[in-house]
Amino acid sequence: MSAHRRGRDEPVREVMALLGDRWTTLILLVLATGELRHAELKRVLTEISFEQAISQRVLTLKLRRLERDGFVARNVTRDVPPKVSYRLTSSGAALHVQAREMINWVKRSSAEIEVARALFDTA
C-alpha cells in the first residue's frame, strides 16, 4: 500500500497533527523542565501563551492524548486528596528534542519565510 493511501490512524499523520495543534508543543516544552502538577502546568501555559488561556478541559484532553501515545506519564499520589502530576516519558523527551529542533529551524528561517510571504502577497 502506498504512503498516500494509508488510513487515518497512520502514526506519522496522527503525531504531526498532534504537534500542529495549539497546545501540544507548548505542553511538551513546559514538561521538559520537569514534573508538574495539573494546576502548575495550567498556570505556566497560561502565562506563556500568546493566545487565550488554556481551559481545564482542553488541558485534560491534551494530557490524556499525550499519555495515551506514551509521551507523558501521569503520577497519582496516595495522599488525601490525591495529587496528580505529569512528566515526559523517554519518548516524550525525544519528541521534545524534535519539536525544539523544528522551532529552531523556523527561527532560523523566519526572514526567508517572511520574504516568500511578501512576494506571494504582492503577486
Which role fits each region the language model picked out?
Residues 1-11:
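Long, low-complexity, charged/polar intrinsically disordered regions in eukaryotic proteins
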Residues 10-58:
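N-terminal helix-turn-helix DNA-binding core of bacterial DNA-binding proteins
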Residues 11, 29, 76, 90-123:
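Amphipathic alpha-helical dimerization/coiled-coil segments
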Residues 59-67:
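Basic amphipathic alpha-helical segments that dock to polyanions
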Residues 67-87:
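Beta-hairpin "wing" of winged helix-turn-helix
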